[in-house]
């Protein structure tokens, strides 16, 4: 049975626990697609809240998986499985636990690859936790590359109970044309999660997923998938289309803008997709993206920006106040953002653009805007003491600035 290449295995074993928390929280829907013929759900509930995300795969979870698999496949060697997953458990990260679960299932479950997958398909409705089902896709990606069509169909099945967006990517790498043809067929699937997988799984730069370099270089092969899904009834699916297009803007912004210019942006759902797809370009002040949404003209305003308090500590709330006065005799459409220059550990700075609002400013009008946020550390951002510069950006142009000191 074929195993993944070393590079694929290395990717799967990366420590991404904090990031995967965001991934898991984004799926705010219960796994209610239960098999009416399945045994009653006996999986342990998710700890509330779990001490660490990796505790989603703890001894109790593994015992429940073993019990269910034994009822599905009586020859399943539960003791071997438990020994494999519990040995060295504490030292394993979340994704290492996911992968070890897949490896241990393969070693303890007799039969061919297809027989094992069919047993796991019976298990899927019984798990009752969307993130835990990710090990099912990991199993397919690890052992199924040589049984391409069967494995792709297995991923289509498993994604209904969680998501196979990471697991499908090795198949795209192995045979892009074949994989994308099958994924295009998924765009007509009655289940929104399968339709979403067609777009999300083929994103060139899926966050925390394996990068699809061929699609980074040339995004055209996924165009038929996005075209088929742009009018999807599900916001869950349409958001994926927008994120997919946003990925492409990072390498081919003119390509995306040309496609969007051909859309009927008077239709609200298409306008939403287009704007969400161009969010990075708009924050960067890209003229073509700004023009597409009516923000192409330089703002005629007098602007002031203030930060309060001017000195604060981590955990306190920062309030920004922008005072705008129109100097134009005509109404103006304005996209307003703010840019924080965060102090780095080295003493330098790195900027991040935040969305503020969009307004129609009447001729010669005055307006005051207020924005506040708590200054706290995240898994993706650590704050350092020092003077932070904040700029006000309107229609892509920096028009005012202020400072605050973080102690």
PLM regions and their residue ranges:
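Short beta-strand and strand-turn-strand segments in soluble, beta-rich domains
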Residues: 345-357
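Surface-facing alpha-helical segments and adjacent helix-coil boundary elements at the starts of domains
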Residues: 42-289, 313, 330-333
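Short acidic/polar inter-strand loop motif in beta-rich domains
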Residues: 378, 394-400
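Short glycine/proline/serine/threonine-rich loop/turn segments at secondary-structure transition edges
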Residues: 377-387
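Intrinsically disordered, low-complexity Pro/Gly/Ser/Thr-rich segments with frequent PxxP/GP/PP motifs
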Residues: 354-374
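Beta-strand-rich binding/interaction modules
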Residues: 318-325, 329-344
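Short beta-strand segments of immunoglobulin-like
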Residues: 307-312
